[in-house]
């Protein structure tokens, strides 16, 4: 029977749960990164023919930041103390991500990925297509190891995400032949191409931890906003980054006239003279790389594009933090996830 103490007991129970969560052992992102790499290194490839599976193993062995699996494990670790339990689904998402890179490299005819020869150059284009297709299936096979009760929501989310990423890639390709791409269209394209997989990884981690639906959804929104900030920062670093830190040559987007947030806004905000000069540099003519990158960067400086992009990054980062604030957990549970996203964005706090 209900008594005046009923509410009090309920509150005490809730507080004791929160207290337990506070005292749990949290893994650092560095520890989780090491676990992901060790797990990937030990994955067996026992099927034949070897020529189909060697490129898959090769692509996954090239390293990388492992952002998506680490985010999934950090998300799970908000509620549960055994992130090792979900290493296979975390690696499934990393397998899928690397499959998209394998096919991207083929579409771009890229020579290098993470300082190593790309699959279609090391083997050939047909191998890259077939191994890539198989890699997508392997990602599903690895994801299907999650417990039966959670399998349906996880597969539904992952499948929707995979479709969205394909849509984002197609939009990106379509934009190459258009001169009227708007800022909103560009933001939607990078949301689909980049953000949704970060969001998906975070939400799957929450689902597998048995988190409340509202918290899982808040983490998805957090990932979406952080993903937008992350991609815009990539655009910015392509122009203003240090090549040593950035890991690739500066000005790649400028050289191929890629419709980035920066170029779209430069055209929108340029005066007649600046627009004419931008159009000249973005025409099909062959230009000296150094000369073209310097000229377009100077135009960006004149128009104030760097500050504009930095403000937009700040906006999405702040929006993301608001969604993380909404996750109903003690603040100390979120410290590691906050620190990791700050590190992703190369921020001190």
Give the ranges of each region predicted by the language model.
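All-alpha prenyltransferase/terpene-synthase fold signal
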Residues: 13-349
């Amino acid at each position: 029977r209900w008594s005046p103490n009923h509410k009090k007991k309920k509150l005490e129970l809730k507080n004791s749960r929160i207290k337990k969560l506070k005292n749990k052992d949290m893994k650092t992102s560095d520890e989780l990164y090491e676990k992901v790499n060790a797990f990937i290194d030990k994955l067996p490839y026992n099927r034949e023919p070897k020529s189909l599976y060697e490129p898959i193993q090769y692509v996954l062995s090239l390293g990388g930041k492992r952002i998506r699996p680490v985010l999934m494990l950090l998300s799970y670790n908000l509620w549960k103390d055994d992130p090792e339990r979900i290493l296979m689904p975390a690696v499934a998402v990393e397998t899928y991500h690397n499959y998209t890179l394998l096919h991207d490299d083929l579409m771009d005819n890229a020579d290098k990925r993470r300082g190593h020869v790309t699959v279609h150059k090391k083997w050939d284009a047909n191998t890259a297509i077939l191994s890539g297709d198989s890699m997508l299936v392997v990602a599903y096979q690895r994801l299907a190891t999650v417990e039966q009760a959670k399998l349906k929501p996880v597969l539904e989310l992952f499948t929707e995400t995979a479709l969205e990423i394909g849509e984002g890639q197609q939009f990106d390709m379509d934009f190459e032949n258009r001169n009227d791409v708007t800022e909103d269209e560009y933001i939607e394209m990078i949301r689909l191409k980049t953000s949704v997989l970060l969001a998906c990884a975070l939400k799957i981690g929450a689902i597998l931890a048995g988190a409340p639906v509202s918290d899982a959804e808040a983490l998805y929104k957090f990932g979406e906003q952080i993903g937008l900030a992350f991609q815009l920062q990539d655009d910015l670093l392509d122009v203003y980054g240090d090549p040593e830190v950035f890991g690739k040559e500066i000005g790649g987007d400028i050289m191929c006239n890629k419709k980035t947030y920066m170029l779209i806004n430069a055209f929108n905000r340029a005066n007649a003279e600046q627009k004419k000069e931008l159009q000249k540099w973005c025409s099909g003519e062959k230009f000296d790389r150094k000369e073209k990158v310097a000229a377009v960067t100077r135009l960006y400086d004149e128009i104030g594009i760097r500050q504009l992009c930095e403000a937009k990054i700040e906006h999405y980062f702040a929006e993301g933090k608001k969604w993380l604030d909404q996750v109903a957990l003690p603040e100390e549970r979120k410290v590691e996830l906050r620190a990791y996203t700050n590190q992703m964005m190369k921020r001190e706090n």
